[in-house]
Every structure is written in structure tokens, then in C-alpha cells.
Design a protein with these regions (language model features):
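Acidic, metal-coordinating catalytic segment for phosphate/diphosphate chemistry
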Residues: 1-35, 41
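Short loop segments at secondary-structure junctions
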Residues: 11, 40-43, 51, 113-118, ...
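Active-site segment of metal-dependent pyrophosphate-handling enzymes
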Residues: 32, 52, 74, 82-120, ...
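A glycine-rich, hydrophobic loop/mini-helix early in the fold
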Residues: 33-64
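Nudix hydrolase/Nudix homology domain
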Residues: 57-58, 101-184
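Hydrophobic alpha-helical positions that pack around
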Residues: 63, 77, 81
């Protein structure tokens, strides 16, 4: 099935046009791309390994992808998480931590607190070949050694302190039995 993306201005106003996946995006126009980092009560991050035949095959990343036409950023994050891992999250459970504009993309980074054993995951075989929970420090080591996608390495470079702060807050909240609030 052919996928289409809605086009936006840099300030996220929908242009009323869409473009087919793979087609060049006109200069000054953007589409939405999401990443969603799943963090468990121990403060570990869920990573998925890209299948070898995909771009950056064999590298580790957080769930993510493009918002398809008619879909909000938040809806795309929830959908991508479920498609790639089988983890169900409600829109109200995911927190938009920050956004960044790069090239032709409006990139949105979400975090969700989910405790799911690896053997309960349902991996999307066309995208993902493995999954594991890692500590923040291990994730940084993996990024430094080229084991993650460039996107993950870039998020750590730009917002690593913020990511660590959110992970620490999830761990503290889980111990206290309180809902997580992480405002950046």
C-alpha cells in the first residue's frame, strides 16, 4: 500500500497537500516524524533492532516513523509503538518531550512508561528483528560505538541530559507509586 504524508510549514501549519513516501519534499515544506522511547520502572529503555534489509539495518533504535496523512503526531507515536513492538499505549499515556526541525522533518520525541517483559513483545518482522531493555549508560555506550541509528545518537547528543532526567523521574515515580510528570 502506498503511504502519503501531510505537508506542513516550519511552524506546523498544515498546507492542505500530501506527498507520497519517497518523493522529494519541496524546500521549506515538512512532514512529521516521531520517536517514542519506552522506559520501564527500573529506568531501562526499550530498544529494537532494525532488520538487516532496512536502512541502518542491524542498528538499535527506539520505535518511530512517519505520521501518515490524516494522522496527528501523537497518533503516529501510539501507532508506531504498537506496530513495532505490540505495546499498546493510550494517547494520554505518552508525553511529548520536545520537537526539532531538521531538513524536511518536524521531529517529535515522546516518552512512555511501560513495564512489558521482552517475551510479551510482538515484533513487526518487516521492521524489527530483536528487542532489549538497556540502561541509559549502556545506550550511550552503544551510540558511541555506532550500534544505534544516527537518530538515537543525535537525540543523545542534543538532549541526553533531558532524557536522563525523564528516565530518573520515571524510576522515582514508579518507586513512589505516583504518576510520572517530566516537564522540560
Amino acid at each position: 500500500m502506498t503511504e502519503y504524508f501531510d505537508l506542513y510549514t516550519a511552524d506546523r501549519r498544515k498546507l492542505g497537500r500530501k506527498i507520497q513516501r519517497g518523493a522529494p519534499i519541496p524546500h521549506g515544506e515538512y512532514h512529521i516524524v516521531v520517536q517514542i522511547m519506552s522506559v520501564n520502572s527500573l529506568g531501562e529503555i526499550l530498544l529494537t533492532q532494525r532488520v538487516p534489509q532496512k536502512t541502518s539495518g542491524g542498528r538499535w533504535e527506539c520505535s518511530g516513523g512517519c505520521a501518515v496523512s490524516g494522522e496527528t503526531s501523537r497518533e503516529a507515536a501510539v501507532r508506531e509503538l504498537f506496530e513495532e513492538t505490540g505495546i499498546r499505549a493510550f494517547s494520554s499515556e505518552i508525553d511529548l518531550e520536545w520537537t526539532m526541525t531538521t531538513d524536511s522533518m518536524l521531529r517529535d520525541f515522546y516518552i512512555v512508561h511501560k513495564d512489558v517483559p521482552l517475551d510479551r513483545l510482538v515484533l513487526q518482522s518487516s521492521e524489527v528483528c530483536a528487542a532489549k531493555w538497556v540502561t541509559y549508560d549502556r545506550l550511550c555506550d552503544m551510540a558511541d560505538n555506532g550500534q544505534t541509528t544516527r537518530t538515537v545518537a543525535r537525540w543523545l547528543e542534543i538532549r541526553g541530559d533531558d532524557i536522563r532526567r525523564c528516565i530518573d523521574e520515571i524510576r522515582r515515580s514508579a518507586r513512589a507509586g505516583a504518576p510520572r510528570i517530566c516537564l522540560l
